[in-house]
Amino acid sequence: MNKKIFSMMAASIIGSAAMTPSAGTNTGEHLTPELFMTLSRVSEMALSPDGKTAVYAVSFPDVKTNKATRELFTVNLDGSGRKQITDTESNEYAPAWMADGKRIAFMSNEGGSMQLWVMNADGTERRQLSNIEGGITGFLFSPDEKQVLFTKDIKFGKRTKDIYPDLDKATGRIITDLMYKHWDEWVETIPHPFIANATDGMITTGKDIMEGEPYEAPMKPWSGIEDFSWSPDGQNIAYASRKKTGMAYSLSTNSDIYIYNLTSGRTHNISEGMMGYDTYPKFSPDGKSIAWISMERDGYESDLKRLFVADLATGKRTHVNPTFDYNVDMIQWAPDSKGIYFLACKEAETNLWEITLKTGKIRQITQGQHDYADFSVRNDVMLAKRHSFELPDDLYRVNPKNGAAQAVTAENKAILDRLTPIACEKRWMKTTDGGNMLTWVVLPPDFDKNKKYPAILYCQGGPQNTVSQFWSFRWNLRLMAEQGYIVIAPNRHGVPGFGQKWNEQISGDYGGQNMRDYLTAVDEMKKEPYVDGDRIGAVGASYGGFSVYWLAGHHDKRFAAFIAHAGIFNLEMQYATTEEMWFANWDIGGPFWEKDNVVAQRTYATSPHKYVQNWDTPILMIHGELDFRILASQAMAAFDAAQLRGVPSEMLIYPDENHWVLQPQNALLFHRTFFGWLDRWLKK
């Protein structure tokens, strides 16, 4: 298989070059969309109990077959001994070490549905552990490994055939409440947690610890098994859930942390009265405390992520980082229970941090122009996953005391070494309200300041997502620069990582300061002699797509081309057709029919569809019909308006993609269409 050949190539070079995954001989190539689609993708990882070996998953996209295969690998933490331990036509997920360090548990769809499997650490003696009807979506063994918690989807609500059994071939859905759709699916199932004995042979069923409750755990669409935690004694399970349905669910972000006792079968809420989004519970190793991530306000999904710790004996809850103005993510207790490690993004760089609970002292462990995306700690050994604008995900060994990082893997070294390096600059720009805005400027390969280049303004989605050092297989800033463009990527008002005041400014101000920030970034870069001011485009997805539609009606000839992916064209239509109403209420300010709602009416007044009369610049719309967050009719309306206005326009519509573009051939079609459009209008 191709992946096997690639694995052998990678294994031959990692041992000697693990410290510098981008080092090697540059052959002067540039990254094309076709070459980009051959890059492998590192995903889940786990550190062995002795801290010496990592197991991790890698997916290999195949454009020809239009699918990706996922395999598992092990590697020593010095970068040596990399080995592919699975090689099947199925896909393997979520590898986890068993306590003896000799076996690895994982999920595989080898039998058709996703089930729990186990094998030796060298890949031998592969054995299926579960045969759960419909498959599982996640698993977590108890500390003594005698029990396993698994999650699976259960039926939710009544379907048409339940109401009319004689109409078993009818396809219509009878809807009676909100949240009938979510993200990219009709809500006919919800995930529930089950526990089962793991020592009695094949697992075919389990006890639903939320039996009879019509609520999600984990919470869709983002949460997974990380929202569960076993107590060290194996007697309790902590989990996060938003125990609401229908309209109440659509209006509220209020979730809570629950602890289920296996002996009594009782559940109690340890975050009762905390009205925001509570998630990611983790018992301390000594079993005395539990930590979790908490937002303060109901209905605000981008509120500050705070770190809370509760004393399990007294129930006392403590906000342990009250002066920390950055989001806390992916917490893990220190082995001695005296501190907690976490990820936090500060000024568009995501690094590893540690808080000492007794003193409240917070220490930044790692530094640098990159994003850490995951980590695991065993004793004094830390394994982390990291990427940047320039390099995709790889694994690194991090010294938790001084932050020194050594590369463990170099999955795409054979390809990356052939490419001409690119440069990424960090610039601070003064905004029109007197603020300071960090803007990334990504330069093309072989950049020559004496030449003129076309440029692209990258508009971020979210809207409250930092333009950090991300690596995306859709919106990839390196890929844009590799096509000969200067990429301008501002952290405009309304993104985290620069204090909560900066982050919150965008709420109720969609067409306001953040749009002026985009224009500021473009105007500042146009002062550079190497930027061709007549050949600048603006691109973006989701809120970035909204930004593009808005800029199309307000840019005063700054731009020569636009691309909007999954963007909002009509804010009133968006309010009436989206599913998570808490988001629309907080960000927009409320429904459009509240004529005396000043904030809402101000927001609706900035809706891009109200300024189509100003459209005069070529624009490409891209959208997926399975996008239930922002319906594809938004792109259709924008395209029709552009066509009727006589504005050069195209639309790429996917019947089988959601808010993202996930299938390999569709992804390559996205890139070819994207760059074809930009080249057509910006490289004349």
From Swiss-Prot:
One of its GO terms (cellular component) is periplasmic space. InterPro entries: 6-blade_b-propeller_TolB-like, AB_hydrolase_fold, PD40, Peptidase_S9_cat. The keyword Protease applies. The active site is at residues 542, 627, 659. Its EC number is 3.4.14.-. It is found in: Periplasm. GO terms for biological process: peptide catabolic process; proteolysis. GO terms for molecular function: aminopeptidase activity; dipeptidyl-peptidase activity; peptide binding; protein homodimerization activity; serine-type endopeptidase activity. It holds the Pfam family Peptidase_S9. Keywords: Aminopeptidase, Hydrolase, Periplasm, Protease, Repeat, Serine protease, Signal, WD repeat. Disulfide bonds: none annotated. Residues 1-24 form the signal peptide. Gene3D superfamilies: alpha/beta hydrolase, TolB, C-terminal domain. It is an enzyme of class 3 (hydrolase). WD repeats lie at residues 87-127, 220-259, 323-363. Coiled coil: none annotated. The keyword Transferase does not apply. Optimum pH is 6.7, using Lys-Ala-MCA as substrate. Homodimer. Catalyzes the removal of dipeptides from the N-terminus of oligopeptides. Prefers Ala and hydrophobic residues except Pro at the P1 position, and has no preference for P2 residues. Shows high dipeptidyl peptidase activity toward the synthetic substrates Lys-Ala-, Gly-Phe-, Met-Leu-, and Ser-Tyr-methylcoumaryl-7-amide (MCA), and slowly hydrolyzes Val-Tyr-MCA. Is likely involved in amino acid metabolism and bacterial growth of asaccharolytic P.gingivalis, that utilizes amino acids from extracellular proteinaceous nutrients as energy and carbon sources. This is Dipeptidyl-peptidase 5.
